[in-house]
């Protein structure tokens, strides 16, 4: 999740790699990119001799709104969008070719930290207008205040008290 779901501008991939190296240097065994319950179970890990198991579950499944059009091409959950950008190196726009296409106008429904990341990423990938669409008022936005301020500084437009 650290490498795929968080934008480069918030958490550089080189820092994640260094921190993982620091952890393994302490003698911690890491099993990354494993789907617990499919390729490996917790019981399998204990059978391998592990005394403790930490399950870093990452982000949960997205909540879709069940509205017409949400299954159209170009409609993603924020986590899927961020993962696509990270895996396809979209954060290196101009340096590497990437198949991540962002429209001229982008709407991000929701106002949490992940929504701010998605909006700021879309803006950085060239979207001319990026909107945060949120059903509640400014005082109820769940994102950290500094994340909201960064989004506004980068030109993200907030449409509050709106519900698609």
Annotate each predicted stretch with a short phrase.
Residues 1-164:
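Residues forming the flavin
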């Amino acid at each position: 999740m650290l490498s795929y779901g968080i934008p480069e501008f918030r958490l550089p991939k080189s820092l994640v790699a260094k921190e993982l190296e620091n952890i393994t240097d302490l003698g911690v065994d890491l099993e990354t990119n494993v789907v617990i319950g499919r390729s490996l179970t917790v019981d399998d890990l204990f059978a391998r001799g592990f005394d403790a198991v930490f399950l870093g579950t990452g982000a949960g499944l997205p909540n879709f709104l069940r509205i017409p059009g949400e299954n159209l091409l170009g409609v993603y959950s924020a986590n899927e969008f961020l993962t696509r950008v990270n895996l396809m190196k979209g954060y290196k726009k101009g340096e590497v070719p990437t198949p991540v296409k962002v429209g001229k106008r982008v709407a991000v429904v929701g106002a949490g930290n992940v929504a701010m990341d998605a909006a700021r990423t879309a803006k950085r990938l060239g979207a001319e207008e990026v909107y945060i669409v949120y059903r509640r008022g400014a005082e109820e936005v769940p994102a950290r205040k500094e994340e909201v301020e960064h989004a506004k500084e980068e030109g993200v437009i907030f449409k509050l008290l709106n519900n698609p």
